[in-house]
Amino acid sequence: MKIISYNLNGIRSAISKGLFDWLAEEQPDVFCIQESKAQPDQIDVMTMQELGYTSYIHSAEKKGYSGVAIFTRIQPDRVVVGMNNPKYDCQGRVIRADYGDVTVICVYIPSGEAEGPKYEYKMEFLEDFLVWIKELRKERPNIVVCGDYNIAHKPIDINNWKRQVGVSGFLPEEREWLDRWEASGMVDTFRMFDQSGEKYSWWSFRAGSRARNVGWRIDYHWVSEPLRERVVDAKILAEVVHSDHCPVSLEVRG
């Protein structure tokens, strides 16, 4: 099973930049997106269907904001929209699909700020999401949690880390949450295969950051420990450009 996760920063914008042609060539089994920034009737599900994908969409109530979706060539046994928590579900942040004994979760973690209401909301989301995943793993032990985490975990995951310590996305408490996430039995699949630096998945639009590779690695496929032995490969597809993020891919057996 090949799973690609991609923060599109607006699906309609990404389509105008050739998303469908790339998708037809890449042909992931499961395509998870974040920041669709679209309502269901604004997403071209007919073209997705022509490409072989069934669409499962979770949009934010606020138009042009947030939103996640799973497009799948494999028929899922079950799809669950949201976390059963209106505080987060109104923003379209989580969608889940079950395939046999494997569960795929697509998440768009809030971007937050260094302080204030957005900071509080992000930290509350992180704690509630961790609890929700722990409970889900009792029922579904083999899980993939892919998406935009809006946190760079370690200094190797961010350009010029010393300048970023007080910046949202690299705050000590955010990174500590990822430490606890990992300690709970979650595996950063990219780091199973690549321990090198300067591997990023997001670049600011400002000052030619992408051309200079001044970026952050904030898009991940984490898997639960029991699924580790079935991970075949994990990559960052940095050459693919439809967004300020790039796609990340994962291959798992069965």
Identify what each model region corresponds to.
Residues 51-54, 127-214, 218:
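Metal-dependent phosphoesterases centered on the DNase I-like endonuclease/exonuclease/phosphatase
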Residues 63-78, 197, 209-229:
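Conserved beta strand-loop-helix elements of the APE1-like EEP
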Residues 1-9, 101-113, 146:
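Active-site-proximal beta-strand elements of phosphoester/diester hydrolases
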